[in-house]
Swiss-Prot record:
Gene: thiG
Enzyme class at the top of the EC tree: transferase
Biological process according to GO: thiamine biosynthetic process; thiamine diphosphate biosynthetic process
Function statement: Catalyzes the rearrangement of 1-deoxy-D-xylulose 5-phosphate (DXP) to produce the thiazole phosphate moiety of thiamine. Sulfur is provided by the thiocarboxylate moiety of the carrier protein ThiS. In vitro, sulfur can be provided by H(2)S.
List of catalytic residues: K98 (schiff-base intermediate with dxp)
Binding site for 1-deoxy-D-xylulose 5-phosphate: G159, A185, G186, N207, T208
Protein name: Thiazole synthase
Source lineage: Bacteria, Bacillati, Bacillota, Bacilli, Bacillales
Subcellular localization: Cytoplasm
InterPro entries: Aldolase_TIM (IPR013785), Thiazole_synthase_ThiG (IPR033983), ThiG (IPR008867)
Amino acid sequence: MIMLNIGPFSFHSRLLLGTGKFPDFDVQQKAIDVSEAEILTFAVRRMDIFDAKQPNLLEKLDVKKYTLLPNTAGAKNAEEAVRIAKLAKASGLCDMIKVEVIGDDRTLLPDPVETLKASEMLLEEGFIVLPYTSDDVVLARKLQELGVHAIMPGASPIGSGLGIVNPLNLSFIIEQATVPVIVDAGIGSPADAAFAMELGADGVLLNTAVSGAKDPIKMAQAMKLSIEAGRLGFEAVRIARKRCATASSPLEGMSVVE
């Protein structure tokens, strides 16, 4: 498969895995291992990265194996998002940041105005910027025009497991994209992840679908395989849909039985 390129980074895996809500560190580590994800995302606000006495994910991981993608979850405006991003960078983490500015507490949908503003501010600060956005086609284009390094449209509300509720909009975002499109939020099953990849997405970021599964380790492996299968299917190019049947067996050269 073709590698996933984000800014100066290249990755074999197209699965980006969130690290929250796992039952314990052991299950989390095993799920990460079997997923073969190379990018791990986490909320800076949920982790006291400056307190050596506070156990956290970074102590348990061989961080040299992964690219860490801190996110600005909890930010309500652009200024808060920038402040969180700078905190992550000051701690020595990767300067790649997932911009997450929530505008509605019920749906957890992003604030489009503040997301645009935060992305612009962080680009000026030299960050590699990956904004979480809705499936708004125009907003995705405006973010792209700013110079962000990837677009991360949600398939459906965060943690809902509803899958891709608006494949048409998602396909429009993918068709106009000049940067990677990583489907983020709402994925519930391996079929959802495969569908996103078949639409032409460059990657899938998920968390709850794995951490909330009855068997997170098996689900992590299932997601890995479904994303690989979906991408291979996209690269292979599926047959055209037709209204009528087409025989799959050749008719030429067949003997006629009387």
